[in-house]
Regions:
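ER/Golgi luminal nucleotide-sugar-dependent glycosyltransferases, focusing on the catalytic module
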Residues: 1-274
Length: 274
């Protein structure tokens, strides 16, 4: 059975003390680059090398347990149940935020104003030639908050793509770099847009690269976002199912049905506001 090395990042004495039992702490106490959030300690770990090819690795933020309701035992049990069949295992909460948007980039633009063009440019930088405007993502390939566990091969490609974004943001001197480093609204405060770009790279890899086999922990069994969409659990299920059907069969009727249902739901939400 493949071993799972699952880390919880800590950046203060308080978050160090809150590392959940069963997870290994990943030290970011020096927190040299808080502007990169979790990417900085994950990057340092991966660049150091020494990963076991048959093992799984995960790097969770201090908010993992609060956002998912999962402890280390349940995460590791899911890894064991998979039996090494998958390259990537997903633990994404907020099912409503997976089902309603066409993809995680649209979801990000809904949450962070004026970021869609930056997301698009970043996606094209990471995966040149990707048809960004036709990307459809669902619960089988959407990753929130870097809550995933994967084998080293996936992590290496993830790091390679993220480093393209990292290099542009660090070098500066372009409008794209400025927008990556620019703060956007987040949790009542602000965070650089590049943080939310990095959080979407795993989803992009899974949607664009069919070579990766992924399995998702049931997202409907994890906490939802608390948005107005949570009033419509049946419709959320239908929306996600239609996207999955479209991804597997490419019949345009599934995507048309998704947009029609989403449009009707949008009308209901607008009426509820008035």
């Amino acid at each position: 059975m493949p071993h799972a090395f699952i880390h919880q990042i800590f950046y203060s004495p308080e978050t160090r003390d809150s590392v959940a039992p069963g997870f290994a702490g990943l030290d970011n106490l020096r927190n040299e680059r808080p502007d990169w959030r979790e990417y900085w300690p994950i990057r340092k770990f991966l660049l150091a090398g020494g990963l076991r090819e048959e093992a799984y690795y995960g790097f969770f933020s201090p908010k993992f347990v609060a956002k998912t309701g999962l402890d280390a035992a349940r995460v590791k049990s899911f890894v064991e149940q998979d039996g090494g069949a998958s390259d990537v295992l997903l633990f994404s909460p907020f099912f409503d935020q997976i089902a309603y948007p066409v993809n995680i980039f649209e979801q990000g633009a809904m949450q962070h104003a004026d970021t869609l063009e930056t997301f698009k440019e970043a996606a094209l930088c990471a995966v040149p030639g990707i048809d960004f405007d036709s990307l459809v993502m669902d619960s089988t390939n959407t990753v929130f908050c870097n809550f995933f566990v994967a084998r080293p091969a996936f992590w290496r490609q993830w790091l390679e793509l993220c480093e393209r974004i990292f290099a542009i943001a660090e070098k500066g001197g372009t409008d794209f770099a400025r927008r990556l480093n620019e703060n956007t609204n987040h949790d009542g405060g602000g965070a650089p847009t590049k943080v939310f770009v990095i959080e979407r790279i795993a989803s992009l890899m899974l949607a664009a690269g069919r070579q990766w086999k992924a399995r998702a922990f049931n997202p409907q069994g994890l906490p939802w976002s608390g948005s107005a969409l949570c009033q419509f659990p049946l419709e959320m299920t239908f929306l996600d199912a239609l996207k999955i059907a479209y991804a597997r069969q490419r019949h345009p009727q599934y995507l048309d049905a998704f947009h029609r249902l989403r449009g009707l739901l949008g009308e209901s939400l607008e009426q509820a506001k008035s």
